[in-house]
């Protein structure tokens, strides 16, 4: 699921039992799917510390009663097997500025008919009777339905939009167990990244709001983990940070630490290039 095939991502035709393969970034649309520089910068940095991940984890006080955060793993919640119920949980931290990225781990076998990931305000509903794509059902939330490949916002009044946008009607994008959510409150956009491939902007117009990570689930005993990757402030990066990024780009990510250690540089500079001064 989500395997790279000749630079693309696997898609499945709904009208054919045979798997079909096509590039996720067609040549004519390639510019639309270029990963924004700030996202690239953030993903090049070391992931957030455990303490910061816990700060941005699921909120055990802001959830459906059919959900609980695990005692032995505060980054993961468990949903009770309650029939005819759709259940949500919000993250602890409401985001108003900066770029933020978090990883969702949601096993494909635990998604069921309605599995939605996105963001919401503090007023978005967290429970409904029956099965539905609850995230994105009102004006207070924005969600990506992983099974339907649809984006929903105020879906009671507005139809869902296909995402990734390049999918044809007879294709379904298989979202793997792990993927990234990128919320840029400075630009007011929400986007997703799968297998290091940026899938384009899912939602716009989010500036000026206070938004929380959220998922809605229907599968009994499903367990979903959220791991905060990190954030970037709105201010431009210092010149030293930009120089570090340029050097790391020139070296490349393969065996990066080994290559940096071989450079004829002072230890303090090697430490800086490897971000070891941060943790």
From Swiss-Prot:
Domain SOCS box per the UniProt entry, residue ranges: 234-279
Involved in binding to the Elongin BC complex as annotated region, ranges: 236-279
Pfam families xref list: SOCS_box, SPRY
GO process terms (BP): cuticle pattern formation; dorsal appendage formation; germ cell development; germ cell migration; intracellular signal transduction; oocyte anterior/posterior axis specification; pole plasm assembly; positive regulation of protein catabolic process
Highest taxon above the source species: Eukaryota
GO cellular component assignments: cell cortex; Cul5-RING ubiquitin ligase complex; cytoplasm; elongin complex; nucleus; perinuclear region of cytoplasm; pole plasm; SCF ubiquitin ligase complex
Keyword line: Cytoplasm, Developmental protein, Nucleus
Disruption phenotype: Homozygous females produce defective eggs, which desiccate and collapse soon after egg laying, or embryos, which hatch very rarely. Mutants exhibit wing morphology defects, including blistering, formation of ectopic vein material, and loss of material at the margin.
Protein name (record): Protein gustavus
Source organism phylogeny: Eukaryota, Metazoa, Ecdysozoa, Arthropoda, Hexapoda
């Amino acid at each position: 699921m989500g395997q790279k095939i000749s630079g693309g991502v696997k898609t499945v035709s709904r009208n054919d039992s045979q798997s079909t393969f096509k590039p996720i970034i067609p040549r004519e649309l390639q510019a639309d799917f270029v990963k924004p520089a700030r996202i690239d910068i953030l993903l090049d940095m070391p992931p957030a510390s455990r303490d910061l991940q816990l700060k941005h984890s699921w909120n055990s006080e802001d959830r459906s009663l059919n959900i609980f955060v695990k005692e032995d793993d505060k980054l993961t919640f468990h949903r009770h097997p309650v029939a005819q119920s759709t259940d949500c949980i919000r993250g602890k931290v409401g985001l108003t500025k900066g770029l933020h990225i978090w990883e969702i781990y949601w096993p494909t076998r635990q998604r069921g008919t309605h599995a939605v990931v996105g963001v919401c305000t503090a007023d978005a509903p967290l429970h409904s009777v029956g099965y539905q794509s609850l995230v994105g059902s009102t004006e207070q939330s924005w969600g990506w339905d992983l099974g339907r490949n649809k984006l929903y916002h105020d879906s009671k009044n507005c139809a869902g939009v296909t995402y990734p946008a390049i999918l044809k009607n007879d294709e379904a994008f298989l979202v793997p167990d792990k993927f990234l959510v990128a919320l840029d409150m400075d630009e007011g956009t929400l986007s997703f990244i799968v297998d290091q491939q940026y899938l384009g902007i899912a939602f716009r117009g989010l500036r000026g709001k206070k938004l929380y990570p959220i998922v809605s689930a229907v599968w009994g005993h499903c367990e979903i983990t959220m791991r905060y990757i990190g954030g970037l402030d709105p201010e431009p990066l210092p010149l030293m940070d930009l120089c570090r990024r340029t050097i790391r780009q020139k070296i490349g990510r393969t065996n990066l630490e080994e290559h940096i250690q071989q450079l004829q540089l002072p230890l303090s500079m090697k430490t800086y290039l490897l971000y070891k001064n941060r943790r």
